[in-house]
Design a protein with these regions (language model features):
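Substrate-positioning beta->alpha
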Residues: 121, 205-206, 222-242, 249
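Conserved Rossmann-fold NAD(P)-dependent oxidoreductase catalytic core, especially the SDR/UDP-sugar
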Residues: 108-109, 117-166
Length: 345
């Protein structure tokens, strides 16, 4: 649906700019650092002062506090159309990293609204403002499902709506449909589907929770398998894709497939703490999520483990990352080496 824009959208700036949504999250904040290091003029969307402080802390972690002051911040919400209009003035390229991540079933409506409707709004503004290219940071959760014939999941693996998926996965898949809709309407787009992204600066969200849990003495592990990648490699790949002539493609981004046990042990070694000792078998995880449901339902504690995330912890999902190497010359850093680097050991 075409947007009806208010006022004069042709305000003159000295230089065209790059817009980053989700600039207060792990990927978006790292993306801001790399863009500014490359001399780009950058605008970022934020929703609260507290969220901006997390990004400021990350710049300090990398000793680039000087660059933080060069960001043009716009207070906006991807669900609020009037605030987005100002954010898109004089923008040429858009990195859409904003997303709501939760595996609490009670957040289903908020997840779908933010991730699908919010992405639809971004796509509509890109079309209305004549954006040259949109890069959307999706997830391997939005890729298809392995089966008896196709054991390794890739960009071409078919999504099966009949199979159970987490609300987050469904929302990311729906968001991708909005991006492809924009492509059909004339917008040049790119989609990247990273695995579990590891990186510093956000200990209480995303993969940072793994480091925090191990540091606090996490006692159990699971033997599920999935793809992992360093945040710096996600950012470098995204930058190279945006700067290239590549368009209307989708790429799985992982360094390799690892078991959760391997990653948790590596984190424990890097932090010089005890490794998780107890194997939580699938039946145990099924009990855990039911206990978690009980505590939430009757004692009003926030959900920490949904049925979908419990299943993911013991599912062996393996991903094919070969497509991106056919388009770009990249060598990803070993995730295990990266874990030691960001842990300071």
């Amino acid at each position: 649906m075409a947007l009806q824009l208010r006022g004069n959208t042709k305000k003159k700036y000295l230089y065209p700019m790059i817009l980053v949504t989700g600039g207060t999250g792990l990927v978006g904040a790292h993306l801001l650092i790399h863009l500014l290091e490359n001399g780009k003029s950058v605008r970022a969307v934020y929703r609260s002062i507290a969220s901006k402080e997390k990004t400021k802390h990350l710049f300090s972690y990398y000793h680039r506090s000087d660059l933080f002051e060069k960001i043009e911040w716009i207070e906006a919400d991807i669900l609020d159309i009037p605030s987005l209009e100002k954010a898109f003035e004089n923008i040429e390229f858009v990195y859409h990293c904003a997303a709501l991540i939760s595996f609490d079933p009670k957040d289903e409506e908020a997840i779908r609204k933010t991730n699908i409707e919010g992405t639809a709004n971004i796509v509509n503004f890109c079309l209305a403002f004549g954006i040259k290219k949109l890069l959307f940071v999706s997830s391997i959760a939005a890729l298809g499902d392995s089966n008896s014939v196709e054991k390794i999941i890739s960009e071409t693996t078919e999504w099966n709506p009949e199979k159970p998926h987490s609300d987050y996965a469904i929302s990311k898949y729906g968001a991708e449909m909005e991006v492809w809709r924009g492509q059909q309407e004339g917008l040049d787009v790119l989609i990247v589907n990273p695995g579990i992204i590891l990186g510093p600066g956000f200990p209480n969200q995303g993969s940072g929770v793994l480091f925090t849990a191990v540091a606090k003495g996490l006692s159990f592990y699971t033997k599920g398998t999935t793809g992992f990648i360093a945040v710096t490699d996600v950012v470098e790949t995204s930058l190279k894709l945006m700067d290239s002539a590549i368009k209307n493609e989708r790429f799985t981004l992982i360094e390799n497939n690892y078991s959760f046990q391997e990653i948790l042990n590596c984190i424990a070694d890097s932090l010089q703490v005890k490794k998780p000792q107890w194997h939580a078998a699938p039946i145990v995880m099924k009990v855990f999520w039911r206990i978690d449901w009980f505590l939430n339902t009757f004692l009003f504690q926030k959900r920490k483990l949904s049925r979908a995330s419990a299943k993911a912890s013991y599912s062996e999902s393996k991903y094919d990352n070969s497509k991106i190497s056919k388009f770009l010359d990249l060598k990803y850093r070993s995730v295990k080496d990266y874990i030691h680097t960001i842990s300071g050991n």
